[in-house]
Amino acid sequence: MILVIAEKPNVARKIAMALAEVKPIKKTLFGVPYYELIRDGKRLIVASAVGHLYGLAPKNDFFGYPIFDVEWVPVYIAEKGKEYAKDYIKLLSVLSKRVREFIVACDYDTEGEVIGYTALKYACGVDPGVAKRMKFSALTKRDLIKAWYNLEPTINFGMANAGIARHILDWYWGVNLSRALTHAIKRASGKWVVLSTGRVQGPTLKFLVDREREIQSFVPQPYWVIKLIFEKNGKKYTANYEKDKIWDENEAKRIVLEVKKAPARVTNIEVKQQNRNPPVPFDLGTLQREAYSAFGFSPKKTLDIAQSLYEKGFCLHPDTLILTSQGVRKIKELSREGEVFALDFNLKLSKAKYRLLERDADEQMYKVTLLDGTELYLTADHPVLVYREGNLAFVPADKLRETDHVVLVLNKSARDNYGFLDLLLEITDSQEDYAILENGETLSLHSLKMLVERGEIKDIAVVGFSHNNFGKVMLRDELWYLIGYLAGKGGEIKGNGVVISSRTKEIVGLTKSLNIDLIETEEGIVLSNKSFVRLLHLIHYTPRVPEVYGIINNTEWLKAFLAGYYDATLLEGLTLEALYKIKVYLQLLGIRAKIEDNKLKVHLEDLQRFRELLGKFSRRKLYVETSQVPVFTDFDERSYDFPRILGGDIYIIGIKSIEKFHYKGKVYDLVVENYHNFIANGIAVHNCSYPRTESQKLPKNLNYKFIIQNLARIPEYRPYAHLLLGMPELKPVEGKKEDPAHPAIYPTGEIPRPGDLTKDEALLYDMIVRRFLAVFMEPAVRETVKVTISAGKHKFFISGGRTVKEGWLRVYGKYVKFDEVTLPTFFIGERIKVLQVKREKKKTKPPARYSPAAVIKKMEDLGLGTKATRAQILETLYQRGYIEGKKSIKVTPLGMKVIETLEKYVPEIISVELTREFEKKMELIMEGKLTKEEVIEEAKIRLTKILEEFKKKELEIGLELAKIVVGEEKPPLIVGKCPKCGGDLIVKYNEKTGKRFVGCSNWPKCNVTYPILQRGEIIPTNKTCCNGAPVVIIREKDGREWEICLDMNCKEYNTIKKKR
């Protein structure tokens, strides 16, 4: 048995669903889920961590410093609030005793490797070197299966060691320096006050302090500005003096006098025009920043709204048949991720990855019936690809007209590069399954797969298949005829054979050539061959259902399978689902058909093609009913879409009827990468787009025109859409950032109905739509005018700016701020009517404080922290009381004093260079050029020297910090007088456990202590009880009060007398 360890519970579920040959069995232990499944004859258990299960803690904690002797302990011991991890550790510990092999399937990065390493070593109690590694970059079924068949022999010890080193260094720095500061205050004041700093926290606080010092040390300087106020065309205007600031008041006075005496004239006019290019498409970060600027949305709120827009409606009935790379499947039966067929920009069939969406519906749906009998059930807002008014466009169901024509798939080019070897390697690599080679040799598919993946075998002919060397089945195209025939006849798998009701001439002779025995029994005719039965299981053979894995990828196989199914059924008496599947398969062979009177009728024009393609394999005279399928052909040859329609893998059918009905139940949709459409019941429909992206590039194959045509139906976007549709070419402006998994954020073209979107969703949708339209538009042209007015030797300037060509600003200008200042017409030599020469006194201003966003940006620029840690570091600074203010960050006196102390005694710890130096060493560990032991030892040496110097000055440091810290502390709560020495009995807290107790203020000279309840407010009563012990009231949150004596032996204490 094998234990697969994932990083998080949801990832464990996805891995289990992907690897299971049948649905995995979900179990729970200690309230934690795990999964059992079979893969290639092997039993697997897929379980998970929940992030880091282990953290660092000192082996022998004396609460002193320096301390370097650390060990990995359960994270709930190392950190408060992580108790939930205990059950995950217990689960892995129990499961590890039931298995012999281990596979790490955590995220493939340093943290993922540390999580896997520590889970193996401490929870499972095994050497991490014995585990194999699943390496994947996406959680699609295809990627996970590929990772399963390409296991790394071990975990990546370079990444694991680098991650372990980083954890240890961060612990060394954070814990030792925090303890040093805390001990310094204790030595100086006798108070335990916890202060903290660290490798990244220190440098971050340092640059905030630097800004605060700039502000505090800033001395405002007076200066004067001079303005020339004049009148032109009945309006007042202001021109500014050529010097921004005049530092001498007397000079300012002199200038004013000289200007007043001299006539003012226009001496120069400078006009410039600049192109302002359109903005690039939205990545998530840019969308978040602009939404904050325009609407005040937080980044989290923007992401939530974008996710909501992404998942809004656009859904299909659960029985909708989807054309996948494995065959035609009901959408409700699809795995969460996989591969479907889609139409590319040129309307050619292509394959693309999908992700399944599911939601509950209680709403109106639409039944769209085409003239060829095809039916499709959609929610009101799910778009269908239609030909309308000479153009192709995606139109939601509730906007469809009966005059519209719908696009269906029709494969016009065979794709036969998929062979038996490809099929066998996809469905199994079991040690018990064998391929029979052309020379008669047998080779296990497991070994064969490894040889192919290593490139040692590139071209090999496979002629047969064997399971456990119990017989063999020959692999020829005719095999698919037999499988199709058995499916049509309802052949049931029983034991090592397939049973049909009676012998038929169609398969006599064929079974013999395929090495399958025919045996007559009381039940009927048995096709006996263990290897054949094994193959049927692997390709998901089901009686009476025209569907097996693999046939869709090879047209010869598809022809043979359909011929066999036809010979067995004559296409009569079939279920509607079977008819639909056969209709889609015929479309993939380039044959159009019609469903009428519960029968499948081939298009009269395609009858000859039907007979030619299936006649190659059929053993009967092919007779099939025909009908004139009303294919639309009246295309506008001037249309932009005409060449693509003519050469595409499609045909177009009119709509017969559109009916509404109410539906309550599950509905589904797909998110399809790159092509953003898929084939449902043979019809091209749209999908959703994905908001979590770092890309500033639109999909290469995206049909921009489709989307813009749909957006033109919204009145407020119509003028801009029509402008773009009139352009000879739609070419977007794009940015440099690219996300290999997801394109930039853009509107899909589905049109929201009134009431579909909330107010906030509507705001964000408007911004996304306008940004999308803007990237296709022409640059804006801005004109600036600078007029020089001279009065004697003195010059004044007045400037204006205006947009002379709107370009993209026409659609996106509401989210861009440009000052529009239009000046009157001036002429060189024109005399200016001066109303006033004004002198104003001003003062210089200090630099602005950082905002939270500016802090994150500064950390990025300095290389401090990571995307995952920067926000938390800033939050820690708030929690420690080092900074305050949510919009404008101010460093508190405590924060200032901590940095002042670190600068004076341990300047290295707040050095950006030190942080960068050790980050470089982490990279060298990963590359195998340094060992983690070398880096950790160097860190110990560096830190030891720092702390040795710190200890020499510990008292001075403590005295400096105590002035701030102790002054801010609340006075201790006095509950009475000590019966032994007369000192104050005060509430204290254990430095290790944090638990409270009552003790004498004269400790350590007096050791009187009392225990006390850990919950509730303590209220002194000024009363005493046994042996002079004080009596106090404990008030709970619900208002109840308890009067108790603090003496443990007091009867009153033992009964806890309730006070009302």
UniProtKB/Swiss-Prot annotation:
Domain Toprim intervals: 1-141
HAMAP family (UniProt xref): Topoisom_1_prok
Needed co-factor(s): Mg(2+)
Record protein name field: DNA topoisomerase 1
Record domain DOD-type homing endonuclease: where: 482-591
Family of this protein: Belongs to the type IA topoisomerase family.
Binding annotation for Mg(2+): E7, D107
Function: Releases the supercoiling and torsional tension of DNA, which is introduced during the DNA replication and transcription, by transiently cleaving and rejoining one strand of the DNA duplex. Introduces a single-strand break via transesterification at a target site in duplex DNA. The scissile phosphodiester is attacked by the catalytic tyrosine of the enzyme, resulting in the formation of a DNA-(5'-phosphotyrosyl)-enzyme intermediate and the expulsion of a 3'-OH DNA strand. The free DNA strand then undergoes passage around the unbroken strand, thus removing DNA supercoils.
Reactions catalysed, as given in the entry: ATP-independent breakage of single-stranded DNA, followed by passage and rejoining
Chain ranges of the Topo IA-type catalytic domain: 156-947
Assigned keywords, A-Z: Autocatalytic cleavage, DNA-binding, Endonuclease, Hydrolase, Intron homing, Isomerase, Magnesium, Metal-binding, Nuclease, Protein splicing, Repeat, Topoisomerase, Zinc, Zinc-finger
Chain segments carrying region Interaction with DNA: 196-201
Note: When a topoisomerase transiently breaks a DNA backbone bond, it simultaneously forms a protein-DNA link, in which a tyrosyl oxygen in the enzyme is joined to a DNA phosphorus at one end of the enzyme-severed DNA strand.
ZnF (C4-type) residues: 978-1006, 1025-1050
Oligomer and partners: Monomer.
Molecular function via GO: DNA binding; DNA topoisomerase type I (single strand cut, ATP-independent) activity; endonuclease activity; zinc ion binding
GO cellular component: chromosome
Gene assigned in the entry: topA
Alphabetized InterPro entries for the sequence: Hint_dom_C, Hint_dom_N, Hint_dom_sf, INTEIN, Intein_C, Intein_endonuc_central, Intein_N, Topo_IA
